[in-house]
Amino acid sequence: GNTVNVLQDRWTYELVGLLSHGVRVGQYNRLIASLEGHIIGDPAFRFQPVEPNTLATDMTTRKGDAAYWRSLLASPWADVQSLALRMLTDAGAISAGELLEFMKQSPLATTRMECLKLIGRFGDEEIFAQAIIRGLKDRYELLRRNAATYAWQSSRLELLPALADTYVNDSESKRVAYIVMK
């Protein structure tokens, strides 16, 4: 009981747009397994794709094909770009620095959030700190909240000025301020 919406600041709809591209529900669940995520029914179920593609099979058959996933970085769809970034990261075919540059130039909020999350997997503290500082100023509130969480988890002193600035100057976002004060 009480397992729905108990966890706060979770990115519960990460990559959910892949379902509109014909990705099967079971494939999506493997990418985004969470305590609050439940599959009831057939995990092989899929929706009709918004445009013809082979994304559902490519996730398996082209898993290590870095050139293919790099080509999808130009997709107009945020979740397709995010999946491509995830596949490149999993294959070791993209660096934390490249992800930071992609985060800086992307107009898509969920893609920027995916970049921040993936940069955290590299262990490059300098680049991660740069991504956190950028994330604290992002217009997407979920990204700001996650950046604030990553900042206090990292305990890096150079993040203190950015956290203080966020607390003082981002008065519209009470949830970000709450995380900063942890």
Segments predicted by a language model, with ranges:
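Conserved positions within tetratricopeptide repeat
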Residues: 29, 85, 97, 129, ...
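Caspase-like cysteine protease fold
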Residues: 12-94, 112
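Amphipathic alpha-helical scaffolding segments comprising HEAT/armadillo-like alpha-solenoid repeats
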Residues: 61-71, 92-104, 124-136, 156-168
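Short acidic/histidine-rich active-site segments
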Residues: 1-10
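Structural detector for internal amphipathic alpha-helices that build alpha-solenoid repeat scaffolds
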Residues: 56-57, 79-91, 110-124, 144-156, ...
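Short inter-helical turns and helix N-cap capping residues of alpha-solenoid HEAT/ARM repeat scaffolds
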Residues: 76-77, 107-108, 139-140, 170-173
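Amphipathic alpha-helical repeat scaffolds
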Residues: 17, 70-74, 82-86, 100-104, ...
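Membrane-interacting alpha-helical segments
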Residues: 28, 173-174
